């Protein structure tokens, strides 16, 4: 027998594993003992244990050596030792996919399966099913049916679970065992009933009606097994989600009835299912919340944890539904289990009132040092949500966050705090200077490069706009002196932004940048030299274009375009307009941040959605002369209902002088194949349809794509808004649903689709301008135009802002899409690029009286984009 080690030895790992230095060849040599007579059960069981250990440690056994060991092991069936026999069953299962001719043990296993020794029968069933393939299954079908309804629970469960595994390869055979499985489902044994219902569900899961009947039967007659109840609750909730059924459904009634079950496991499963159902109202959640409230006072820690974690999830969407539990949650704040206490606190932060925040913060402070970073992040996220809910409490919450920031913690924890502080600074102008000062202190002793560079970027963006910007320069320049190259480069960029926006500080900034020109690192030197030359010109347009706003292109797209340019040498200079525009700010384009300690491997730049479309369209001969793709619509437009015989979705692709409409078509009729599918389009305005690219064949349920190429208006270039009537034309060929063979002859048919709208937003790509005022000055007023409009149907500033942003398809800058409370005036700042690469900026001043009055001022370097904006708004 193996030496018995106590738990302490096991945890210390000090030589407690007797199999640690096993060699495969030595173990296989030992396996020859299996051929000896008489059989030594104890020794053979020990060798089988070694073989199993090697396999489970990932040791590779060759087919020949595995087969030899397997055949030797079959001789051990001559022994009646129960331990050795069980080890044989385990070895058969593990070696069934390594050794050859494993079916040699079929007769021995069948004998054990039908024998009188109950301890052998269950494991024999499992081992037999492991080595049986679909061709042999019918030979043991009779034995399997008998085993399923066996009076011994272990045998019945083994047969049911094995049947479940066999479903994957022999569904039609196992389906014939349904009657036996139904008989087993009425067993008094909880595991047999659970496994039987599991098998029945997997046989019927593609038949929605049959599954509903199963649940109805369970509702009427009940079950003895709590495990079976839990499974049926999950099945019912899945059915509800798929059907998008109403809460009056019998399925929902069944789940709700399980809240009154005598087993805590079932009650929690039902409550969890109701909470996770999409679109549940507070009223429908009430019974589940009541049950979870009772669990909060349970003496069992596992139940308390489950309850408070689930209530935490409810509080995210329905905080009012959890308010009734606040007293119970407050009692859990002092729970000895810190995980429970943390979840209770974060739930209270989501449901508590403004007056309770100070008290909650004190309670959190008392145990923050005792919980893991993972739970600290949860607390920070809850505080972040609270800041948005109660902006007047930002001072209390900020102080708490700064205290946490000074404490020890990992990268994810510190990043969560920094994210939260930055969001408070952006949302609440009163907290800006306090927040920036504390972040300056943090980077003095910050070990994480990602956080230091992010804070430096924020200081460069927000610092120059404060009342005393010079106080931040010392902190930024300290980074140039004390940090490594990545942080130094970030600090140089931040310094340049101060110089670009503050003429008084410019001489001092130039002195500091001249010192940076002598840096050891290329990146730092290059940045310093570049910024120095730009700032010395003392031109606002240059500052805006090269320092404050920078490039608005996709970083991965730029990298790919430059790589392509170097691979194909050309006398023409690199054209920046050939690079796709960024659909997100530069900071958001970067890959997931990692701590500086992590070793970064070179990564292949992933293609963006627009680049994928660019490649697909370039492969179509008719589109090769269109130039670079300017924009693709963010979401496809559905031109049919999802339940109709043909499902058509359209993606709009905009080029400089053309538009391509991509129609993704799916044929949902299994007795038809469509050929030469096109979508004919009739414009209402001056657009001109140039050609159609058909989808050659559209078999059943296989998506296909056809295209329509349209020229943009030339006579009246401002008439960009247009409605197209669409009709799908195709040739129908009948086909056999079973074989898929189509008829040779077909007939022409057509199908009317929904109208398709083209709006001004399809011609503008949104871009982020970090400093709108600088960008506004950079564009200049040569083509500035201004008009005033009355929005008679709009009654609030928030609605007006939302509609304008959506209609124009431009990016709101400097958080101007957020309308302050109790204001009747607001200025919305929008930035974009018109097709062809022309910057377009819009400043919209809004006044709310009885209705909303809007004064729109547009600027661009070309006249056409300005005219289009004003024409579309009018």
UniProtKB/Swiss-Prot annotation:
PTM sites of type Phosphothreonine: 594
Membrane topology classification: Peripheral membrane protein
Biased composition (Basic and acidic residues): 1-11
Statement: the UniProt record of this protein carries the keyword Iron: no
Keyword Membrane set for record: yes
Annotated GO biological process: endoplasmic reticulum to Golgi vesicle-mediated transport; establishment of Golgi localization; intra-Golgi vesicle-mediated transport; intracellular protein transport; organelle transport along microtubule; protein secretion
Family matches, as Pfam families: Adaptin_N, Coatomer_g_Cpla, COP-gamma_platf
Location(s), subcellular: Cytoplasm; Golgi apparatus membrane; Cytoplasmic vesicle, COPI-coated vesicle membrane
Alphabetic keyword roster: Cytoplasm, Cytoplasmic vesicle, Disease variant, ER-Golgi transport, Golgi apparatus, Membrane, Phosphoprotein, Protein transport, Repeat, Transport
Region (Disordered): 1-21
Region (Interaction with ZNF289/ARFGAP2): 609-874
UniProt-recorded Gene Ontology molecular function terms: structural molecule activity
GO cellular component annotations of the record: COPI vesicle coat; cytosol; endoplasmic reticulum; endoplasmic reticulum membrane; endoplasmic reticulum-Golgi intermediate compartment; Golgi apparatus; Golgi membrane; transport vesicle
Coiled-coil stretches noted in the UniProt entry, renumbered to this chain: none
Source domain of life: Eukaryota
Function: The coatomer is a cytosolic protein complex that binds to dilysine motifs and reversibly associates with Golgi non-clathrin-coated vesicles, which further mediate biosynthetic protein transport from the ER, via the Golgi up to the trans Golgi network. Coatomer complex is required for budding from Golgi membranes, and is essential for the retrograde Golgi-to-ER transport of dilysine-tagged proteins.
UniProt disease link: Immunodeficiency 128: An autosomal recessive immunologic disorder characterized by persistent bacterial and viral infections manifesting in the first year of life, and defective humoral and cellular immunity. Affected individuals suffer from recurrent respiratory infections, bronchiectasis, and failure to thrive.
Family as reported in the entry's similarity comment: Belongs to the COPG family.
Name recorded for this polypeptide: Coatomer subunit gamma-1
């Amino acid at each position: 027998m193996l030496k018995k080690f106590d738990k302490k030895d096991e945890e210390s790992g000090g030589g407690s594993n007797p199999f640690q230095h096993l060699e495969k060849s030595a173990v296989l040599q030992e396996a020859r003992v299996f051929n000896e007579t008489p059989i030594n059960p104890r020794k053979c069981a020990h060798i089988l244990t070694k073989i199993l250990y090697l396999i489970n440690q990932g040791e590779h056994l060759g087919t020949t050596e595995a087969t030899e060991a397997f055949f030797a092991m079959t001789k051990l069936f001559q022994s009646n030792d129960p331990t050795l026999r069980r080890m044989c069953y385990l070895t058969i299962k593990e070696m069934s996919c390594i050794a050859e001719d494993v079916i040699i043990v079929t007769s021995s296993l069948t004998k054990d399966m039908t024998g009188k020794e109950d301890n052998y029968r269950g494991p024999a069933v499992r081992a037999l099913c492991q080595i049986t393939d679909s061709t042999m299954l019918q030979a043991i079908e009779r034995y399997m049916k008998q085993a399923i309804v066996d009076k011994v629970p272990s045998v019945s469960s083994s047969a049911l679970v094995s049947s479940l595994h066999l479903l994957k390869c022999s569904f039609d055979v196992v389906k014939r065992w349904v009657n036996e499985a139904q008989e087993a489902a009425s067993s008094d044994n909880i595991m047999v009933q659970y496994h039987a219902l599991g098998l029945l569900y997997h046989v019927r899961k593609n038949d929605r009606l049959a599954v509903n009947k199963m649940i109805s039967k369970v509702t009427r007659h009940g079950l003895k097994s709590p495990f079976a109840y839990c499974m049926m609750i999950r099945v019912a909730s899945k059915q509800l989600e798929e059907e998008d059924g109403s809460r009056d459904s019998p399925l929902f009634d069944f789940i709700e009835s399980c809240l009154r079950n005598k087993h805590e496991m079932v009650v929690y499963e039902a409550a969890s299912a109701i909470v996770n159902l999409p679109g549940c109202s507070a009223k429908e959640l009430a019974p589940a919340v009541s049950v979870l409230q009772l669990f909060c006072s349970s003496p069992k820690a596992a139940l308390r944890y489950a309850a408070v974690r689930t209530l935490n999830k409810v509080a995210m969407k329905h905080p009012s539904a959890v308010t009734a539990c606040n007293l119970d949650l407050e009692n859990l704040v002092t729970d000895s289990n810190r995980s429970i206490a943390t979840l209770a606190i974060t739930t209270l932060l989501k449901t508590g009132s403004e007056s309770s925040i100070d008290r909650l913060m004190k309670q959190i402070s008392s145990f923050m040092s005792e919980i893991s970073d993972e739970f600290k992040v949860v607390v920070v996220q809850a505080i972040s949500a609270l800041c948005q809910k109660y902006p007047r409490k930002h001072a209390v919450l900020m102080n708490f966050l700064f205290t946490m920031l000074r404490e020890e913690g990992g990268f994810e924890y510190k990043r969560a705090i920094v994210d939260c502080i930055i969001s408070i600074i952006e949302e609440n102008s009163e907290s800006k200077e306090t927040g920036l000062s504390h972040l300056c202190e943090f980077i003095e002793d910050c070990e994480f490069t990602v956080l230091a560079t992010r804070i430096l970027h924020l200081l460069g963006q927000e610092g120059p706009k404060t009342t005393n910007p010079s106080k931040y320069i010392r902190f930024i320049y300290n980074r140039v002196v004390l940090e490594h190259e990545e942080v130094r480069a970030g600090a140089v960029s931040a310094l340049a932004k101060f110089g670009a926006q503050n003429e008084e500080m410019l001489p001092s900034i130039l002195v500091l940048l001249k010192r940076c020109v002598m840096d050891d690192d290329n990146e730092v030197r290059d940045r310093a030299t570049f910024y120095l030359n730009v700032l010395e010109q003392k031109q606002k347009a240059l500052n805006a274009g090269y320092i404050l706003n920078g490039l608005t292109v996709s970083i991965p797209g730029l990298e790919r375009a430059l790589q392509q340019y170097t691979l194909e040498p050309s006398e023409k200079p690199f054209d920046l307009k050939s690079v796709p525009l960024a659909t997100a700010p530069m900071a958001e384009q970067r890959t997931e941040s990692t701590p500086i300690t992590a070793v970064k491997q070179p990564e292949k730049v992933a293609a963006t959605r627009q680049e994928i479309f660019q490649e697909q369209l370039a492969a179509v001969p008719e589109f090769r002369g269109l130039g670079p793709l300017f924009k693709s619509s963010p979401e496809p437009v559905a031109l049919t209902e999802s339940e109709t015989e043909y499902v058509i979705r359209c993606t709009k692709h905009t080029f400089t002088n053309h538009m391509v409409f991509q129609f993704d078509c799916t044929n949902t009729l299994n007795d038809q194949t469509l050929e030469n599918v096109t979508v004919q389009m009739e414009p209402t305005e001056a657009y001109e349809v140039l050609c159609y690219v058909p989808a050659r064949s559209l078999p059943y349920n296989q998506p296909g794509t056809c295209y329509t190429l349209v020229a943009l208006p030339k006579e009246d270039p401002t008439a960009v808004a247009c409605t197209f009537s669409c009709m799908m034309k195709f040739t129908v060929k009948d086909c056999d649903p079973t074989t898929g063979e189509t008829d040779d002859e077909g007939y022409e048919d057509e199908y009317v689709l929904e109208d398709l709208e083209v709006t001004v937003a399809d011609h503008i790509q949104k871009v982020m301008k970090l400093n709108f005022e600088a960008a506004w000055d950079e564009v200049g007023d040569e083509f500035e135009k201004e008009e005033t409009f009355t929005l008679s149907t709009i009654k609030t500033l928030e609605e007006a802002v939302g509609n304008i942003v959506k209609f124009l398809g431009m990016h709101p800058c400097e958080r101007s899409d957020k309308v302050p409370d109790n204001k009747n005036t607001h200025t919305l700042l929008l930035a974009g690029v018109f097709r062809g690469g022309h910057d377009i900026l819009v400043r919209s001043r809004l006044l709310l009286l009885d209705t909303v009055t809007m004064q729109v001022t547009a600027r661009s370097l070309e006249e056409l984009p300005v005219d289009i904006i004003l024409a579309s708004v009018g």
